[in-house]
């Protein structure tokens, strides 16, 4: 018997290197999002043909079979409030993401951060991203997507920009460009991991 599709689903994924973040992530998530389904992908076993974060597009494709609208969150994202309203901002046929302002500033190009990705259905760019991570020489999933959408017109076709508060990265604090009401604080990198451990020990 076929399972009925959910209308909304939040997903994340981790492997043995990052699963220490999971308890902290879930504690914050469920504090603010009771009733909003969460699916966790085990990246130690899921999509064995891919490594690490390159599994992310595969997880999103799998989730598109489970729900009409999906939000991916990295496990180093601190969920500070309900994110249910984020589903209302999703645009069909696009990946909905926040601009990575620090990377854009430092590189001179427009980057979008792949730590938070929202979408409806199964956008064409999602399958293209999955195919590209299988053959890429780029160092991460975000770099792969950026290389695919570097051209302004291509980016306009496939990426829809979400408000800054839905993915405020650690370097935003350093650059002093944080939004007023942060919904998702993304503690990126080694220093971000240190901050997460500090919060877990409080």
Predicted features along the sequence, with ranges:
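GT-A fold catalytic core of metal-dependent nucleotide-sugar glycosyltransferases
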Residues: 52-111, 118-119
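A residue-level signal for conserved active-site and pocket-lining positions in enzyme catalytic cores
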Residues: 10, 29, 60, 76, ...
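Catalytic core and acceptor-binding pocket of nucleotide-sugar-dependent glycosyltransferases
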Residues: 119-202
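N-terminal anchoring/stem segment of glycosyltransferases
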Residues: 1-55, 65-66, 153, 188-196, ...
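Residues that flank catalytic or metal-binding motifs in active/ligand-binding sites
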Residues: 6, 56, 73, 112-115, ...
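Non-transmembrane alpha-helical segments in soluble domains
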Residues: 26, 30, 84-87, 130, ...
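Lumenal/extracellular "mature" regions of secretory-pathway glycan-modifying transferases
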Residues: 24, 30, 36-56, 95-113, ...
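Extracellular/periplasmic catalytic domains that process cell-envelope and extracellular macromolecules
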Residues: 3-5, 90, 108-111, 175-180, ...
């Amino acid at each position: 018997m076929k399972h009925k599709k959910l209308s909304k689903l939040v997903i994340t994924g981790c492997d043995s290197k990052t699963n220490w973040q999971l308890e902290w992530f879930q504690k914050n998530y469920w504090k603010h999002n009771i009733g909003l389904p969460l699916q966790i992908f085990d990246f130690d076993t899921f999509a064995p043909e891919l490594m690490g974060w390159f599994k992310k597009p595969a997880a999103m494709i799998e989730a598109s079979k489970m729900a009409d609208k999906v939000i991916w969150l990295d496990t180093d994202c601190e969920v500070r409030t309900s994110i249910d309203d984020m589903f209302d901002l999703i645009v069909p046929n696009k990946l909905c993401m926040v601009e990575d302002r620090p990377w854009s500033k430092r590189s001179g190009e427009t980057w979008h951060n792949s730590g938070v990705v929202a979408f409806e259905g199964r956008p064409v760019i999602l399958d293209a991203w999955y195919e590209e991570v299988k053959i890429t020489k780029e160092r991460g999933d975000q770099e792969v997507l950026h290389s695919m959408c570097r051209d302004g017109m291509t980016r306009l076709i496939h990426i829809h920009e979400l408000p800054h508060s839905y993915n405020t990265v650690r370097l935003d604090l350093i650059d002093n460009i944080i939004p007023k009401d942060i919904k998702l604080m993304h503690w990126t990198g080694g220093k971000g991991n240190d901050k997460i451990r500090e919060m877990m020990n409080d």
